[in-house]
Structure formats: C-alpha cells, structure tokens
Regions:
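Extreme N-terminal starter segment of soluble prokaryotic enzymes
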Residues: 2-6
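Short, glycine-rich nucleotide/cofactor-binding loops
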Residues: 7-18, 191-196, 267
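Active-site and donor-binding regions of nucleotide-sugar-utilizing enzymes
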Residues: 9-33, 37-133, 219
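A short helix->loop->beta-strand "cap" motif at the edges of active sites that frequently abuts
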Residues: 103-107, 210, 284
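C-terminal amphipathic helix plus adjacent low-complexity
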Residues: 153-155, 311-377
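Donor-nucleotide binding loops and adjacent catalytic segments primarily
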Residues: 172, 179-259
Length: 377
C-alpha cells in the first residue's frame, strides 16, 4: 500500500509558497503514484494557477491531488504517513497531537526555502527532536548534490526542447495570449516585485536598437509600469508602445502555461522561488528579483546563488551578469547594466542552457523526498 502524504501550505508571499507546494503535490501524484492531500489556508491564491479550482471548497480533487482548505478552526483528521510543513508553517496543534498518538509516528519534514548558501548542505536532513517526542527533519532544496535538489518533472526538459524547436508551437501559444511581436523583436517576460530601477530599465528598452516586446503577467510590478507610461493602472490585455518598446499586460496563467511563457521568451525577469526555478529550466538568460529581507539579509542569499551560477563565464560576461543582477536588486542604474549585459548575449544564452543541463543531472526535489522517506523505513 502506498504511503499517504500531507503537505501544509500557509500562503505568505502571494503565489510563491502555493506555487511550490502545488507543483510538488502534482508531481508526487503523477510520477510517484502517491496519495497526497494539499492543505492551503488561502485558496484565493491557489485558484489563479489552477483553472477550474473552487476557492470556496473545503475539499476538491485537482489533477489527482486532494486539495483541502486549511481552516482556522481545525477539524480532526487522521495524519498521513509523511507530513510536510512547507516553509516553517505551524501545523495545527490538534494535528500534531494526532501525529504523536499514532502507533508509528509519521515522517515529519520541514521543507525549507531554497538557498545556495554554504550552510544549507550541513543542515539538509538534520533531525530536530520535539518536546512532545516527535522528530522533525529539515529538508532543503538546493543546487548541489548535498541538498534536496530542485523541483523538476521527469519530462520537463524534453517538453521544453520540443516546444522551443517548434516555431509553430511557440506562435500558437503566444497568439492564444493575444501576443503578436513584430519580426525580430526581443521577447522579454517581467514578473517582479515593485522596483525603483524599473523606469531606468524601461528607458533602456525603449531606446534600444532592437525592438522589444515586454510581457508582464498581472501582479505587483504593473503599477510601476503604468506610472512609467503616465497612465492609470493598466488592465489585463493592455498593449502600449513607446519607441522601440511594446508593453503588454497578460492575465495570470496556469503553471504549465507560465512554463511555456518562459520558454517563449528570450529573457525572463522573475521573482520569489517558484518562477525563479522555472526560469532556470527555461534555459534562457534571466534575472531574479529576490524577496527583500530585514537588514538586507537577502543580498547574501543573492550573492550565494550567483557564486554558483556565474561559474564558467568569461571575466567580461561575468562582470556584466553580476552588474545586472545587483542593479535590479540593489538599486543601481539598470539602463547601464542592461546595455552591458547585451554586449555578451550569445555567451549568456549558452551559459543559461548549460546551467539547466548541469542542474538536471542531479535528482529532482520530489524524487529526493520519496527516497528520503523510503530510506527512513
């Protein structure tokens, strides 16, 4: 009999937390044949990425996953064999007590935020005995073989390659979104938090020698985009042109369509964790807007990733990439940084592709979790 899995997700940062846990739950069901319940405290954050989902349902089945609303007033349920608390969320006290009362305690995993910092390898898989006698294990996603790896479906890169090698597939997908870039335009996606350097980047795109079509899924960055255009907040479907730059606001799409959007673009600016990982799998030059933390703690996290990602670049391309990422995240001139990066475009393209290949050589996160459970028996 297959093990049962419970994944708890408390929505903190809009779509990032639910994005990761929904992908994980889907993969555990589809590729490992597991029975998975996904507990979400805010289903309004879930429905945009899962068309057909009901934000008011206490229970619903979506793509083989038993999706449950995590109510403030917890109703008793039997705990699963494997319990994952995503991103240090606090499980219901009554559920934890039911875990303790089981004849065989479940495997309790704390799925941590993704980080490339050196200390992650030493903490991955460490147990944390609890006062009630249970044991919680810290499970860290990451970029090295001494971590839990990244979320990656088994067929992901093959599907990406087939899509990117088919001009017809790309054109059909973009037309379905109402996107019709002019011939030879650089296609760029932008999914980010508010950023004071947005205007300087847009200025550079608008005055560039190559036409640019900027695709912006609805979200927090749209207000800044509208301000740069001198307009009221742009509704979904809006298309505006300023010199060489065409700006288009897209609707929120499913996770699978978001992957296709990233695959379609020549450059992807992303944020948070879920879209950050998916942009890496897209194999295109990218830019990450990291989530801001107190006392600029996020800068260490940013530089830790860049220390891995930049390996193999020429000194000139390395400096340009570093300058671009720091400009976007540390409030330096994005216009100059963008122009510098464009001078090394072929190398950055090849490097992004090789990075995806190297990361795909490691076990994916879902498989690592399943193996960890089996080894614990």
């Amino acid at each position: 009999m297959n093990a049962t899995w419970d994944i708890f997700c408390s929505v903190v940062d809009n779509y990032g937390d639910i994005g990761v846990t929904w992908r994980l739950a889907r993969q555990l069901v589809a590729e490992h044949g597991l029975a998975v319940r996904l507990w979400v405290d805010d289903l309004n954050a879930f429905t945009p990425m899962c068309p057909g989902a009901d934000a008011g349902a206490a229970q619903q089945w979506q793509q083989g996953v038993d999706v449950r609303h995590w109510p403030a007033a917890w109703q008793p349920v039997a705990p699963a064999d494997v319990v994952i608390g995503a991103f240090a969320c606090q499980l219901p006290a009554a559920y934890v007590e039911a875990m303790r009362a089981r004849a065989t305690p479940p495997l309790w995993l704390n799925l941590e935020y993704l980080s490339a910092e050196d200390w992650v390898e030493g903490c991955h898989g460490l147990p944390s005995p609890q006062p009630n006698g249970l044991r919680k294990v810290f499970f860290f996603p990451g970029f090295t073989e001494k971590t839990g790896g990244l979320l990656r479906e088994g067929s992901l890169l093959a599907r990406r390659d087939a899509f990117q090698q088919s001009a017809e597939a790309r054109q059909a997908f973009l037309q379905g979104l109402g996107v019709e870039p002019e011939q030879g335009a650089l296609l760029v996606s932008l999914f980010a938090y508010e950023n004071p350097q947005l205007a300087s980047w847009l200025d550079a795109l608008a005055t560039g020698a190559q036409p640019c079509h900027l695709l912006v899924p609805q979200g927090r960055i749209v207000a800044g985009l509208s301000q740069w255009l001198g307009e009221a907040p742009l509704p979904v479907g809006s298309v505006r042109k300023r010199r060489a730059l065409t700006v288009q606001v897209l609707p929120f799409v499913s996770q699978d369509d978001f992957d296709r959007l990233l695959w379609s673009c020549d450059f992807n600016a992303v944020r948070g964790e879920d879209s950050f990982v998916r942009a890496q799998w897209a194999g295109q030059p990218m830019l990450w807007h990291i989530y801001v933390q107190d006392e600029n703690a996020h800068w260490e996290k940013l530089d830790a990733f860049l220390a891995h990602y930049r390996r193999g670049l020429s000194d000139e391309a390395d400096a340009a990439l570093l300058g671009l990422w720091r400009a976007w995240n540390m409030d330096f001139d994005m216009g100059q940084a963008w122009q510098a990066a464009r001078q090394h475009w072929p190398e950055l393209q090849q490097h992004a592709r090789l990075w995806a290949v190297r990361q795909a050589a490691q076990p994916d996160l879902a498989t690592a979790l399943v193996h960890f459970y089996r080894n614990s028996l």
